[in-house]
């Protein structure tokens, strides 16, 4: 989406992607959810003392 619309503001892109995500079925979302869990576990293992500090 960013490559197709290089001048689109990030907030607009987030809205559109969020709308597309809501249209996906649970089965379509599952690979992304599973990958996020895998990456979260990997990050926690690699950086056990990490604390998010905005």
Swiss-Prot record:
Top-level taxon in the UniProt lineage: Eukaryota
Cross-referenced Gene3D superfamilies: High mobility group box domain
UniProt record, GO biological process: developmental process
Keywords assigned by UniProt, alphabetized: DNA-binding, Nucleus
Primary location group: nucleus
Keyword DNA-binding among UniProt keywords: yes
UniProt GO molecular function: DNA binding
GO cellular component: nucleus
Subcellular location: Nucleus
Protein's name in the database: SRY-related protein CH2
Species, as recorded: Gallus gallus
